[in-house]
């Protein structure tokens, strides 16, 4: 199917899948291939037309007619198919009518050249419009993707900040609770230690008082014992002095007196 300006003008590309930018690459490539093929065919048909006109000029020159010089024409496929029968009939016409036919063909070829130029301009303009549209759509898509990426990044950062703040607040709360509990435990241990220390010191003080009392009793007993012993010994010495050195000493009496001394001290 030949390509027409209407086909180029009315062609529509589908939107790309999610995640792609611009039009669908396969469709764009296929369309460009089609344009390339049609333009190649147009050039080839142009060359055929040029060759046929040159052949017609040679026939006119060989027949002695006065025709127009060679004419180069450029036209689309539709125009070539329209004038091709006239070129064939011109070869079969009499020499007298060939000049008129060549002149008409030259005029028609000029119109075809103008039409080809207009078609080329229209194709160029359409391609530029499509290119601008594709570029604009690509920019819009890029801006949209960039905006979505920016929003996603901002949302991610905000969510991460919220989580970090929540974790920090939770950590601070736990730290305060643990610190308070540790302080309470330390206070309790200190209070218990102070209580036990007070109890121990009280018991030690009480025992010290008892020991000091007993020590004082022992000291008193020692003083009294020494005093009684001294008194007893003095009395014995005095008694011995009175009896004289000749009289025997009654050991039983002395032992009984010493026992009496001990009983008195006890």
Curated annotation (Swiss-Prot):
Residues 239-266 are annotated as: Disordered. Residues 31-64, 152-203 form a coiled coil. The keyword Transport does not apply. The keyword Secreted does not apply. Gene3D superfamilies: 6.10.250.660, F1F0 ATP synthase subunit B, membrane domain. Important for maintaining cell shape and cell wall integrity by localizing peptidoglycan synthesis to the cell poles. This is Cell wall synthesis protein Wag31. It comes from Mycobacterium leprae (strain TN).
């Amino acid at each position: 199917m030949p390509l027409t300006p209407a086909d180029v003008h009315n062609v529509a590309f589908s939107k790309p899948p999610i995640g792609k930018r611009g039009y669908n690459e396969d469709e764009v490539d296929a369309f460009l291939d089609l344009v390339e093929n049609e333009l190649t065919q147009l050039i080839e048909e142009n060359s055929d037309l040029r060759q046929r006109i040159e052949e017609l000029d040679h026939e006119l020159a060989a027949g002695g007619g006065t025709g127009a010089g060679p004419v180069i024409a450029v036209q689309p496929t539709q125009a070539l198919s329209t004038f091709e029968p006239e070129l064939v009939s011109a070869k079969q016409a009499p020499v007298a009518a060939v000049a008129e036919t060549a002149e008409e063909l030259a005029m028609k070829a000029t119109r075809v050249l103008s039409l080809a130029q207009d078609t080329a301009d229209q194709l160029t303009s359409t391609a530029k419009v499509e290119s601008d549209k594709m570029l604009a759509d690509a920019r819009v898509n890029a801006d949209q993707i960039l905006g979505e990426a920016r929003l996603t990044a901002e949302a991610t950062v905000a969510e991460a900040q919220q989580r970090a703040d929540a974790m920090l607040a939770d950590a601070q709360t736990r730290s305060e609770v643990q610190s308070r509990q540790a302080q309470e435990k330390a206070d309790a241990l200190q209070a218990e230690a102070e209580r036990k220390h007070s109890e121990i010191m009280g018991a030690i003080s009480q025992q010290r008082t008892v020991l000091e009392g007993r020590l004082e009793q022992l000291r008193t007993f020692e003083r009294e014992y020494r005093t009684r012993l001294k008194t007893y010994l003095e009395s014995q010495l005095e008694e011995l002095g009175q009896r004289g050195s000749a009289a025997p000493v009654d050991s039983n009496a002395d032992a009984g007196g010493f026992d009496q001394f001990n009983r008195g001290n006890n």
